[in-house]
Amino acid sequence: MKLINHRLLLLSLVILGSCNSKKEVQTVSLKDSYKKDFYIGTALSKDQIEEKNATEDSLIKKEFNAITAENIMKSMFIHPEKDKYDFTLSDKFVAYGEKNKMFIHGHTLIWHSQLAPWMEKIKDSTAMKAFMKDHITTIVSKYKGRVDSWDVVNEALNEDGTLRQSIFLNTLGEKYLIDAFKLAAAADPKVDLYYNDYNNEEPAKREGNINLIKKIKAGGGKIDGVGIQAHWKLNYPSLAEIEKSILEYSALGIKVAFTELDISVLPNPKDLNGADVNQNFEGNAKMNPYPKTLPDSVQVKLADRYASIFKLFLKHKDKISRVTFWGVHDGQSWLNDWPVKGRTNYPLLFDKDLKPKKAYYEVMKQNDTK
């Protein structure tokens, strides 16, 4: 009888130890796993900023230590009329980050897309200069010492590395880029200032981006980092090109951030890459192969892709400041409606039910020695 009790006691201790071990593993988060390496961030929607879903909110606070506003700081929302700013949501966003001791990234000051209608009517250089000075100075000054970094200019390059035609280039010429960084630095000398773009890990666009950064510096602009958006696919871009980009941008003496990371598992019409919001195509069943669930075989491919990417990030952790996912979970991803509306994509680490996917565990595994 005594022997049986000892066995029962031993079995109980083993079971208890196993349960505690599982609980401990589950409490480890992305931000904790990578806290010695770089920030792990996410883009927040309006509803998430307003904490409308308690389960989502708990997940955000547990897993991430950096935040970017997905939309509400873009000009059409924050500066809807010439003499009117609306800081209601941006105030909530910054307060959310401060309350949760998160790195706060402002997105974005100058971008050719999602402009307020009144901005699109600006036709001459004098009016454009006045707009840029007022817009950048007002917003950056308001959050001086509270926002940690800004995307000063977003997506100003074509795929071949030349400057994109935009209302800013057409009215002010390429000097608008230097002026934007000067204005932001004057408004908050200590905040980190970034240029942000997609596909700028591809050779031609990367070369154009490097030349642009050099011009901004030569013109007296303060630029602290480059944002590589990282809207990628299962097989694009190559790890070699990503690594070249990290090395070549870092060699300029600036920080490298991956700012909008997601990995599409769906076919793209015409096999286009990147994140040009003007790309829109009609959908069909072939373009939406996984409307209900992602097959295990594709889950494995997604997990392997994320694993290889984060292994590379860790190799160059001394050069990388932040890795931000473009959304918290699959259900909110912009890729469900781009470049084809109404599809079901699975590009992030958490599914639409907020459950961690195989890709999540593979990302965690890359750093499980710490």
For the regions a language model picked out, list residue spans one by one.
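Sec-dependent signal peptide recognition
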Residues: 2-11
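C-terminal motif of bacterial Sec signal peptides marking the signal peptidase cleavage site
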Residues: 16-18
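Bacterial signal peptide processing site
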Residues: 20-22
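Noncatalytic carbohydrate-binding groove/subsite architecture in carbohydrate-active enzymes
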Residues: 32-33, 37, 45-57, 167-285
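Hydrophobic faces of well-ordered beta-strands that scaffold small-molecule active sites
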Residues: 40-44, 65-69, 104-108, 148, ...
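Substrate-binding cleft and catalytic face of glycoside hydrolase catalytic domains
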Residues: 66-80, 89-194, 198-200, 267-268
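Aromatic-rich peripheral "rim/lid" segments of glycoside hydrolase catalytic domains that contact
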Residues: 121, 142, 151-174, 183, ...
